[in-house]
């Protein structure tokens, strides 16, 4: 024992690791000594040592370690004095200590027991006592609130703490009673600057207060909700007892009503079995449970559908009246109206859906939606619209499974339930705007809906039973063919072209102007439009294939005229003319391509089809020294770039015929440009225009700028058919073109072109590229000298 005592000096004392707490100078508290090493360390003090009442204590980082290592102990601890020692019956000891100072420890083991050499670490000198006093007062106020919220700290603590005269001891006492993790408390112990320790303590207390306030708020709300649920449950039970006494039972009445529907509705066998099964479950459920509400909602939807097959004779269509209505509501579109009346005729004769799904494809504003409404009116069927633009979830079509929170049937079933009819016209609007994501592709979900062989057994995920959609007339609309081919294959495509200028004029006179006069509160005698004014609107204030923009402009003029009439007593009416339209709408917004007067070398006029109709497109070319390469610019797509290369390759194969020497096209690069470079351009129909431009450039022969052309060119010089002929010819007429070269393969399309366009143009169908040169160039190419223009 004497040898052990000799190891303990004034600066080396036994070290006692403590768990789950941090000690601060100034505290007086009991400590339980129970671990074997700690008991041995206590006993080694002996009875006669001068250090028997002084020990070192520090916190261990891991509270689960029974025998902590030196590295698992914090190096800042405390020096304490034992004021009382009591041996417990289980050979453990309970000591009462007074913490004296904060110390820095150098820990080691002596005879396998922890000892440490220590250096006292005092607080820094206080420079601004008043500031510290204010900060401490603020900390005490916060801690008082913290005590009220925590409900785990004795409210009398502050009375005891405030009895300290040492500000550092006050901070230490507050920190010791803070309920937080050991690491945060240890950081407070290690701070020697009293001001900084107060600030850190204040931050910790403020954060804990926020956490406790949030927890208290959540607990309060949860308690209120629980009380409300208990109250509702109590009242419901009480109501049940009262109803039983009176002989009234709403729940039984509801179930009886559902059972009656199941018995009387013409449900399919599968649907009836499903309804019976769900009703049986409902009877066994607590009426106020969430599951009961979901089951009742399912039965309401299932039994709310029109299961009874409506009489086939309900379809009664007057074909002549339907055609009259179509003509009254839609100008032009003769082929479209003819196909619609054929469709209606088959419906009238068969008295049932014929399985043909029509799909109207055309630019915005050409009347696709109104055509569908006309079909609904002609068939005397209810009309419903399913907007597919932006739909990206397959569940929008097939519905969600009942296991999902907030599950509902798909839009098709929902529309049928809303209209309560199977004889329904459903417009699938903007079918080309469907998108896809990780939840599936709605476009392919529509395959089952639109397939006549499958839609009689359509199964919505929510219903989980088959439902017959064969009586529903589905009609789709789109702006382009940009949707999956299998879906396109399910439908009959009816293309609706943009309106030509004359058609827009008639639509404006007979539909748009009367509508806007009425909508804006004007009288027919108060405003009038000349034909020239309407044409001015069409040509220079709108650029579209349809008439929506034109209607908006007419509406704008009507509003300004109304304001003018109401603002002046002298003005009773206004006449809108080509000359004064600028006063209402400002300067012209658009300009169309116009033919130039002077023929030029290396410039050809092509014809382009755009979303807003047709337009002239210039093809320019120059030569620069190089290696016989072609460069095409003007924001062109891949197809147009390939068309440029094809035209150049065909020219090279025929260069000798055009009296162009080999050196001329192998020592120069050709730069082909399409002006208005900000506008994207693509497609093969500029092939012959590019070819003509190259020949003109290499031979020096000007191109007639009264001639425009369209057609795809092959490497053999053949001219292939193109699309959008009507719009292109309209653009040629508007631009002052006299002669238009088109592919011979488009000759049959001329039957659909209005005479008002054909009569003003010399339209020449051709099949070979060399034939184009004879018409488009100012002189015959084979007789020209072999000179070039750069």
UniProtKB/Swiss-Prot annotation:
ATP-dependent serine protease that mediates the selective degradation of mutant and abnormal proteins as well as certain short-lived regulatory proteins. Required for cellular homeostasis and for survival from DNA damage and developmental changes induced by stress. Degrades polypeptides processively to yield small peptide fragments that are 5 to 10 amino acids long. Binds to DNA in a double-stranded, site-specific manner. It is found in: Cytoplasm. This is Lon protease. NCBIfam families: lon. The keyword Nucleotide-binding applies. GO terms for biological process: cellular response to heat; protein quality control for misfolded or incompletely synthesized proteins. The active site is at residues 685, 728. GO terms for molecular function: ATP binding; ATP hydrolysis activity; ATP-dependent peptidase activity; sequence-specific DNA binding; serine-type endopeptidase activity. Belongs to the peptidase S16 family. Homohexamer. Organized in a ring with a central cavity. ATP binds at residues 362-369. It comes from the Bacteria. It comes from Orientia tsutsugamushi (strain Ikeda). Its EC number is 3.4.21.53. Residues 13-209 form the Lon N-terminal domain. CDD domains: RecA-like_Lon. Induction: By heat shock. Residues 598-779 form the Lon proteolytic domain. The keyword Hydrolase applies. GO terms for cellular component: cytoplasm. Keywords: ATP-binding, Cytoplasm, Hydrolase, Nucleotide-binding, Protease, Serine protease, Stress response.
């Amino acid at each position: 024992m004497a040898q052990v005592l000799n190891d303990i000096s004034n600066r080396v004392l036994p070290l006692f690791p403590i768990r789950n707490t941090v000690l601060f100078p100034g505290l007086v508290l009991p400590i339980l000594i129970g671990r074997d090493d700690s008991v041995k360390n206590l006993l080694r003090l002996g009875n006669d040592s001068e250090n028997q009442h002084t020990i070192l204590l520090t916190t261990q980082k891991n509270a689960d370690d029974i025998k902590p290592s030196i590295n698992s102990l914090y190096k800042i601890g405390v020096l304490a004095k034992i004021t009382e020692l009591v041996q417990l019956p289980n050979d453990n000891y309970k000591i009462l200590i007074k913490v004296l100072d904060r110390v820095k420890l150098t820990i080691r083991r002596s005879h396998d027991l922890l000892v440490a050499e220590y250096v006292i670490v005092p607080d820094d000198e206080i420079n601004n006592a008043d500031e510290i006093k204010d900060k401490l007062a603020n900390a005490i106020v916060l801690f008082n609130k913290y005590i009220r919220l925590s409900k785990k700290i004795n409210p009398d603590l502050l009375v005891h703490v405030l009895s300290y005269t040492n500000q550092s001891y006050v901070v230490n006492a507050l920190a010791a009673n803070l309920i937080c993790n050991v690491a945060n408390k240890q950081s407070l112990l290690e701070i020697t600057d009293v001001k900084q320790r107060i600030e850190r303590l204040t931050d910790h207390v403020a954060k804990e207060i926020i956490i406790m306030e949030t927890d208290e708020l959540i607990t309060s709300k949860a308690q209120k909700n629980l009380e409300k649920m208990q109250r509702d449950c109590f009242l419901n039970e009480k109501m049940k007892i009262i109803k039983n006494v009176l002989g009234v039972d709403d729940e039984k009445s509801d179930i009886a009503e559902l059972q009656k529907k199941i018995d009387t509705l013409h449900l399919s066998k599968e649907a009836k079995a499903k309804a019976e099964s769900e009703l049986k479950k409902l009877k066994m459920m607590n009426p106020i449970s969430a599951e009961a509400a979901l089951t009742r909602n399912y039965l309401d939807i299932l039994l709310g559908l029109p299961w009874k097959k409506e009489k086939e004779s309900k379809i009664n269509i007057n074909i002549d009246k339907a055609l009259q209505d179509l003509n009254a509501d839609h100008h032009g579109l003769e082929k479209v109206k003819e196909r619609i009346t054929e469709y209606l005729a088959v419906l009238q004769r068969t008295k049932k859906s014929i399985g043909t799904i029509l799909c109207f494809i055309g630019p915005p504003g050409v009347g696709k939606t109104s055509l569908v409404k006309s079909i609904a009116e002609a068939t005397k069927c209810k009309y419903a619209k399913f907007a597919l633009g932006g739909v990206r979830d397959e569940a929008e079509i097939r519905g969600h499974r009942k296991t999902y929170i907030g599950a509902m049937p798909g839009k098709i079933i929902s529309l049928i339930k809303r209209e309560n009819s199977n004889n329904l016209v459903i417009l699938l609007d903007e079918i080309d705007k469907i998108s896809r994501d990780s939840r599936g592709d709605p476009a392919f979900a529509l395959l089952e809906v639109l397939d006549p062989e499958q839609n009689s057994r359509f199964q919505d995920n929510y219903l989980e039973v088959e439902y017959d959609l064969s009586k529903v007339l589905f009609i789709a609309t789109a702006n382009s063919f940009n949707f999956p081919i299998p879906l396109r294959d399910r439908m009959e495509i009816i293309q609706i072209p943009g309106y030509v200028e004359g058609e827009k004029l008639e639509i404006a006179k007979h539909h748009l102007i009367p509508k806007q006069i009425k909508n804006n509160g004007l009288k027919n005698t108060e405003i009038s439009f000349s034909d020239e004014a309407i044409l001015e609107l069409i040509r220079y204030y709108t650029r579209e294939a349809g008439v929506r923009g034109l209607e908006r402009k007419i509406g704008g003029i009507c509003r300004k005229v109304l304001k003018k009439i109401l603002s002046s007593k002298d003005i009773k009416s206004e006449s809108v003319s080509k000359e004064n339209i600028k006063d209402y709408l400002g300067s012209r917004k658009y300009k169309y391509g116009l033919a130039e007067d002077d023929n030029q070398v290396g410039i050809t006029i092509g014809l382009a089809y755009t979303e807003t109709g047709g337009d002239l497109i210039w093809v320019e070319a120059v030569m620069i020294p190089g290696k016989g390469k072609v460069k095409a610019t003007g924001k062109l797509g891949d197809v147009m770039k390939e068309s440029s290369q094809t035209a150049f390759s065909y020219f090279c194969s025929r260069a000798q015929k055009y009296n162009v020497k080999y050196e001329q096209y192998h020592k120069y690069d050709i730069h082909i440009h399409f002006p208005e470079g900000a506008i994207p351009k693509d497609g093969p129909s500029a092939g012959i225009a590019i070819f003509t431009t190259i020949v003109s450039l290499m031979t020096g022969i000007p191109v007639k700028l009264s001639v425009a052309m369209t057609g795809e060119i092959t490497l053999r010089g053949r001219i292939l058919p193109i699309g959008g002929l009507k719009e292109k010819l309209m653009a040629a007429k508007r631009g002052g073109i006299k002669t238009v070269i088109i592919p011979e393969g488009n000759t049959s399309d001329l039957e659909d072109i209005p005479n008002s366009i054909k009569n003003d143009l010399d339209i020449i169908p051709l099949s070979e590229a060399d034939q184009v040169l004879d018409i488009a160039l100012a002189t015959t190419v084979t007789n020209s000298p072999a000179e070039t223009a750069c």
